Every structure is written in structure tokens, then in C-alpha cells.
């Protein structure tokens, strides 16, 4: 009696396993270093960072000193990120450029872990273009900014006033063009520089 090999379906769970291991490593590294990193909470000065945008240009938070800045840490494979991005774009269209900036920091691997279709090899630029995003998209594949801000999940967002102080921190997705967020941003924009 001979045993015939079962034909492969071509589907593998390996990409998902790699993604889970990567996320677990990021969380583990953040947990191990938590005593060495000062807490980032409402009322503290936002840590400065520098990271490349999608065209390779260097962007620093300090380049936006005197502006109100929304720093959003996200990934292409994150469903709540996908859901909140359109509201960020609407907010940016209404008040972006008048002393208000959004810096969306992707923690995706070089090519992105998953595309919009759920397949491996998602592209950050493709993601942003498919949603019509016009605010700056930054790329931090090492997760350094996530660690620096002690973010524990994606999306995690920090609203920073003209004085460099964190005024709001949101873990999870939200509707950024909702009145309570717009009112706070308008108050921060009205504050002296």
C-alpha cells in the first residue's frame, strides 16, 4: 500500500505567525525597557523624534515647534487604523496647515506586513493613496517612536499643543473630526505660541 501525498492548498499561516511574533517582540521590548523610559502622559513634554517620510525625507517633531500636532502611531494591518484614517483626513482638510499638523507614523515593516486585501506585502504608500490621505505619512519600521511614546497598541494618538505639551492621548481608533476633538484642537490653536 502506498500513501499519496496530500496536495497543498497553497495557503500558509506563516505570514500571520511572523506578524504575531513581530508584534509580540515589540511589546516585549517595550515592557523590558519601561523602567528606562520616562512615562509619556497628558501634561508632559512630547518626546522629540526624527524619522523618514515615504519619500526618504527626514521629519522631526521639533520641525513643528509652535504648531498643534497630532502624532498617530498606526499600521496598515490595523483595522481600527483603517477605520479612523478617513476622519483624520477630513480634520486635516478642514484645519490642516493653519498651525495644525498630522504626523501619521507607520510601524509597518519595510514593505508593510499586509495590504488592504489582507495579503502579505502591503504597501504604506498604496494604503495612503487608496484612502486619499494628504497629511504626512512617516515610516518607523523599527518601532522606535512607539517605544519612545510608550504606546502599547495601534492606533495610539497624541495631541500636542503649541507649547510641546501632550494634551490628549487616545489608545484605539476614534472619529478625529468629532466636535470634542475639533473643539480641543481649536482651543490649542488659539493659545499663544
Residue ranges and their predicted role:
Residues 70-72, 104-106, 159:
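Hydrophobic beta-strand core positions in alpha/beta domains
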Residues 1-50:
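N-terminal targeting signals for export/organelle localization
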Residues 61-82:
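Short active-site neighborhood of thiol/selenol oxidoreductases, capturing the structured segment around
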Residues 83-131, 141-147, 183:
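Structural microenvironment flanking redox-active thiols in thiol-disulfide oxidoreductases
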Residues 46-47, 69, 154-156:
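Short loop/turn microsegments at loop-to-beta-strand junctions
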Amino acid at each position: 500500500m502506498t500513501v499519496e501525498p496530500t496536495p497543498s492548498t497553497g495557503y500558509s499561516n506563516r505570514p500571520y505567525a511572523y506578524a504575531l511574533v513581530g508584534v509580540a517582540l515589540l511589546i516585549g521590548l517595550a515592557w523590558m525597557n519601561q523602567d528606562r523610559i520616562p512615562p509619556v502622559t497628558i501634561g508632559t513634554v512630547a518626546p522629540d523624534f526624527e524619522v523618514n517620510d515615504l519619500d526618504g525625507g527626514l521629519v522631526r517633531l521639533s520641525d513643528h515647534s509652535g504648531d498643534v500636532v497630532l502624532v498617530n502611531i498606526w499600521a496598515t494591518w490595523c483595522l481600527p487604523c483603517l477605520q479612523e484614517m478617513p476622519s483624520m483626513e477630513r480634520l486635516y482638510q478642514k484645519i490642516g496647515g493653519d498651525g495644525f499638523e498630522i504626523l501619521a507614523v507607520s510601524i509597518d515593516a519595510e514593505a508593510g506586513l499586509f495590504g488592504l486585501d489582507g495579503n502579505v506585502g502591503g504597501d504604506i504608500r498604496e494604503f495612503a493613496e487608496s484612502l486619499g490621505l494628504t497629511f504626512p505619512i512617516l515610516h518607523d519600521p523599527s518601532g522606535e517612536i512607539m517605544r519612545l511614546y510608550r504606546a502599547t497598541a495601534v492606533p495610539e494618538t497624541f495631541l500636542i499643543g503649541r507649547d510641546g505639551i501632550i494634551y490628549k492621548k487616545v489608545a484605539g481608533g476614534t472619529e478625529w473630526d468629532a466636535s470634542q476633538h475639533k473643539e480641543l484642537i481649536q482651543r490649542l490653536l488659539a493659545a499663544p505660541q
